[in-house]
């Protein structure tokens, strides 16, 4: 089994080819982040589908898998256990890799996938430099039309959101300056649930409108509002999904859940990451999360309204951890377990040795 990963600094896999493709590629290289810290993670991740309904037939599952991104470098990836049907697919809309497998209920073991991988995660800071950013052009907006959609579900640019964006940004043309205004606004307007408890009180639909009403308290709600505000001003913005790896859980079997964050595009900088929810809980250090991300997270997926490959019977708006269908109907009962160890001072010789091994065999199947 082989995977060709996107260039580490490209910021994405190629999913569309425009006459302006050179602009897309160069903008990605411009976004290669300045690293201020690195952590090497060794991770074991498993998925198992459970609680199948009586009389169930076909079981299909699409699950998150890691790959090279601007702030992370995959050094090794192994499939430890999986059905014979396992394959790596790419969704055509976002170009991201997924683990896909299918089987028949009641025949053999439950649908179970276990992987192990090593990933070098970078802490980045200071990427939102307004002095280096240029104004967005018509060419930029043509190239990134997908990230400028005004009608994307739960991130619609309504008249209310358009007015808020215009009132905040005024005549400002610099995308970084505008995005910072939106970042500060969402923090002032909303509260992430973790400020008050351990579980969200909202619906967690990733809804800009819910966030405005004060009933959306998840990271997806806060970032949906930020994205809608950016798009209202013609600033391309996209949604990224990952997981935070809390040092307190090192060596423990657990499900780390998910954390999303957006990236907006600025000429001269490329795609700039930020985390409104982390900023919201950081007090007077909120600004560190505008153009910066910690190395205590992994990136998995991107976008909404997923066109999975092979095509799912139901097209999901959000995919958190994975998507399972039983006889063509969504099935939410599956477990995800992660266990990780970390090295906060990885030696370059060690990383280089693993990377050399990876170059010869990117993905190995070591068990069934």
Model regions and ranges:
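N-terminal secretory signal peptides that target proteins for export/translocation
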Residues: 1-15
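Low-complexity, Gly/Ser/Thr/Pro-rich intrinsically disordered linker/tail segments
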Residues: 289, 293-368
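Intrinsically disordered, low-complexity N-terminal segments that are enriched in acidic
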Residues: 34-125
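Acidic low-complexity segments
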Residues: 10, 91, 112-193, 200-209, ...
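Solvent-exposed, acidic/flexible segments
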Residues: 54, 154, 158, 172-179, ...
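Glycine-rich, acidic and aromatic/proline-enriched surface loops and short helix-turn segments
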Residues: 181-195, 225-228, 232, 267
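Hydrophobic/aromatic-rich core segments of domains that either
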Residues: 221-313
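Bacterial N-terminal signal peptides
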Residues: 18-31
């Amino acid at each position: 089994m082989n995977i060709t990963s996107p260039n580490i600094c490209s910021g994405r896999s190629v999913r569309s080819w425009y006459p302006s493709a050179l602009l897309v590629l160069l903008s990605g290289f411009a976004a290669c982040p300045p690293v201020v810290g690195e952590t090497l993670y060794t991770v074991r991740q498993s998925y198992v589908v459970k609680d199948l309904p009586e009389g169930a037939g076909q079981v299909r599952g699409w699950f998150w898998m890691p790959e090279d991104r601007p702030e992370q470098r995959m050094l090794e990836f192994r499939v430890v256990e999986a059905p014979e049907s396992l394959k790596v697919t790419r969704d055509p809309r976002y170009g991201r890799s997924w683990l896909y497998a299918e089987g028949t209920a009641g025949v053999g073991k439950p649908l179970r996938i276990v992987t192990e991988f090593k990933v070098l995660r970078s802490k980045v800071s200071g990427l939102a430099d307004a002095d280096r950013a240029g104004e967005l052009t018509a060419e930029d907006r043509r190239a990134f039309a997908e990230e400028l959609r005004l009608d994307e579900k739960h991130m619609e640019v309504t008249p209310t959101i358009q007015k808020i964006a215009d009132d905040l940004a005024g005549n400002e043309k610099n995308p970084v300056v505008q995005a910072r205004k939106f970042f500060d606004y969402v923090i002032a307007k909303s509260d992430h649930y973790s400020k008050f408890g351990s579980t969200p009180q909202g619906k967690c639909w990733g809804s800009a409108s819910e966030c405005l009403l004060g009933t959306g308290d998840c990271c997806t709600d806060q970032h949906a509002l930020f994205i809608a505000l950016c798009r209202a001003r013609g600033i391309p913005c996209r949604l990224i999904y990952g997981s935070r790896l809390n040092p307190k859980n090192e060596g423990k079997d657990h499900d780390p859940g998910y954390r999303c964050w957006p990236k907006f595009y600025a000429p001269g900088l490329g795609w700039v990451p930020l985390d409104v929810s982390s900023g919201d809980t950081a007090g007077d250090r909120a600004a560190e999360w505008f153009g910066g991300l910690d190395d205590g997270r992994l990136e998995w997926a991107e976008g909404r309204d997923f066109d999975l490959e092979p095509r799912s019977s139901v097209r999901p708006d959000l995919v958190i951890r994975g998507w399972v269908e039983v006889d063509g109907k969504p099935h939410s009962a599956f477990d995800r377990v992660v266990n990780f160890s970390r090295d906060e001072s990885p030696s370059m010789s060690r990383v280089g040795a693993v990377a050399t091994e990876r170059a010869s065999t990117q993905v190995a199947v070591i068990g069934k």
